[in-house]
Amino acid sequence: MNLFEIDKEVKLQKTVRVLVYPNITFQEDLEKDSYIQVIKKQISLLNEIRDDLWFYLILPCSVPSLQFTNVTQYVVPMPTYPPTMRSHFDVPRIKEILSRELDFDLVMTHLPEHTHALKNVMYNTTHHEPKFFGYCHWWDVKDVVAWSKDSFIQQITGVLEYERCYLNTQHQKDLVINQAKKTFNDDTIIKLNDILVPQHLGVDEKDIVDKINETPEKIIVFNHRPDTYKHFKEFVAVCDELYEIRQDFKVWVPLLPNPTRKYMVTTKGNKEWYYKELQKCYVGFSPKQSYGGWSVSTTDGMMNGVPYIMYDDTYYHELNEMGDFFEDDHTAIQLLNTYLDDPEYRNEEASKAIDWMKNKLVYKDKMLEMLFYMDRLVIETRAVKDTDRFKDIVEWIKTAGKLSKKDIIERLGWGRGIKWTPYRRALMNHPNIYDVNGSTPYYYYKY
């Protein structure tokens, strides 16, 4: 029997099925939410590398930009206020999603505060026991949290349920570890240190310009949020002092509603327009940050051929260790004068920035590394031995040609106390058993 002749539209493969749990903080416009942007880029790049992945995304509503051919979206209403969202875990709805009909080889969670609850429901009320890993782009570290009560302890206890949790920078990891030391013992800190792994948010290789603009306008760009945690007032003070010395430059702040100085411009446009405008800029300014996260604004500029002067701290050295750094306002003004006065030096630094992006910060390379780790987790997942019951399941599939997971569970008559995950792993390790490239898993026997 040749099953390819029976189901010609079905692609048989060793599918890796991933449940993805979100961290949504900007429901007002989901397409602009940082999590949505990251997961969209991750899935897109992972799909470029291989075609045997299926993602189950939990979302507050359907998201058009995430309608990939290998994505199933499940709507779970969520509170919009971040502290409330992080306290709300919808057990009944999550149990519905963790259906007897589905398989999950991995769980990728972006919200540590819910990870223990998710694992608790999954392991104790379903047949599933996959390994957990994930990514966290926001940490409730002191001096950054805007609300009265943070969720830092819940974040740490959740992260301890991960095999690995990616975060933006080593600086961010150090902040988390140092604050955790005030609550947790040494053994826990050692475990936490092993789980947390920096993963830099690189860029699409196609977005890096081939060559720099060698005759840019004398524009200093501050394309970060003009907020306190980005030290915007301090940046303006630097520009005020520079403007007293010279008046041959402008400052572009695209995220500022309106100019607050006569040398400022705040023009705005879509993403394509924004990139074109960056290419006209002379130099960028990356300020001190209270949080020490990854600066997408800086990589936006660098990939468009803009050299940046950056505050001298580890989170910017991770971003471009070959760049120019300032420790104080005086040094910042000196550097800005150097760039504005020496176009040859400016162009050399711009070319170095592009080379750095191409060699160090292509996001697809980061996704390839993550994919290797995902494969490792799948391989390490426990598989049953060649038991009589497992042989029965293989024979059922062979005789029927194909069976769904639900069909198999019903034949077995198992309750939730018997775990299916080790049997799925053994089936996927079997040389003749294949899954399909669809939302609902089916097990085929291929001769």
State each model region's role.
Residues M1-P64, L242:
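N-terminal subdomain of nucleotide-sugar transferases
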Residues V16-Y21, Y166, V203, V209-K230, ...:
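Conserved donor-binding/catalytic core segment of Leloir-type glycosyltransferases
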Residues Q37, P343-R382:
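A charged, aromatic-enriched C-terminal amphipathic alpha-helix characteristic of glycosyltransferases
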Residues L106-M108, V121-V144, V159, Y166:
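Active-site proximal beta-strand in glycosyltransferases
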Residues T109-T115:
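Short His-centered aromatic/hydrophobic patch
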Residues I153, L160-N193:
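A short, active-site helix/loop in glycosyltransferases that binds the activated sugar's phosphate group
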Residues K276-G293, V306:
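Acidic donor-binding loop of glycosyltransferase active sites
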Residues M303, P307-M310:
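Short hydrophobic beta-strand element within catalytic cores of glycosyltransferases
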